[in-house]
Regions:
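Calcium-binding acidic motifs and repeat modules
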Residues: 18-83, 89-201
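Sec-dependent signal peptide recognition
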Residues: 2-8
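C-terminal motif of bacterial Sec signal peptides marking the signal peptidase cleavage site
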Residues: 13-16
Length: 201
């Protein structure tokens, strides 16, 4: 899947975005802290998630039930209490999934990559900003390779990754920040990496 297609899918999937302020980060929190949002895994929820055919289907169940938990604050990055590079609400969605731990780690690696896209100022095209954007894009390539290594089907990789990006860029400000990052990658190429353990964080 090309970066252009991914960009179009993300922009198309984000509707009713709210305008937000300029803050790029929240106040620092202890790295040992737990995420500020947690979803209770009831027997009914577990059974419902286990009955889904794909990871993306599970994510959609969680989204439909817990959409109000999504952060829509003025902060570009939103709350990350344990400072692991993943917004607390998105981490809560991933933590409740009925998947193996290697798959959960791959999802978090993908979510962390998506979050990092908007953690830097890419409004100006400078040598350093292009270099940073390229570095982040390579992390996304590694996340895709990790998905495949842990056994996630290609269609599920595409759909789950697209949904995580949509959840991450869920305000107008966040979407515009992502587009600023993506603009710096115009004309660049991406090489599909082999599914190897070395690409998993």
């Amino acid at each position: 899947m090309t970066r252009t297609l991914m960009t179009m899918l993300v922009v198309a999937s984000i509707a009713g975005c709210n305008s937000s302020g300029d803050s790029r980060s929240t106040s620092p929190s202890p790295a040992s802290a737990t995420p500020s949002i947690q979803i209770e895994k009831t027997d009914e929820l577990i059974a419902t998630l286990k009955s889904q055919k794909t990871i993306n289907d599970q994510l959609m169940v969680i989204y439909e039930r817990y959409e109000p938990l999504l952060d829509r604050s003025d902060s570009l990055t939103g709350p990350d209490t344990n400072q692991d590079g993943i917004r607390d609400d998105i981490e809560a969605f991933i933590d409740v999934l009925e998947v193996t731990e290697p798959v959960r780690k791959a999802l978090k690696q993908d979510a962390r990559s998506a979050q990092e896209n908007i953690s830097h100022d890419f409004s100006d095209k400078t040598e350093s900003s292009v270099s940073k954007a390229t570095e982040i894009s390579k992390k996304f390539d590694r996340a895709l390779a990790c998905y495949e290594f842990v056994g996630v089907e290609v269609d599920d990789i595409i759909n789950s990754s697209r949904l995580l990006m949509s959840l991450t860029y869920n305000t107008k400000k966040r979407t515009l920040a992502f587009l600023s990052y993506n603009r710096l990658l115009n004309g660049s190429t991406s090489v599909m990496l082999a599914p190897e353990a070395t690409y998993c964080e």
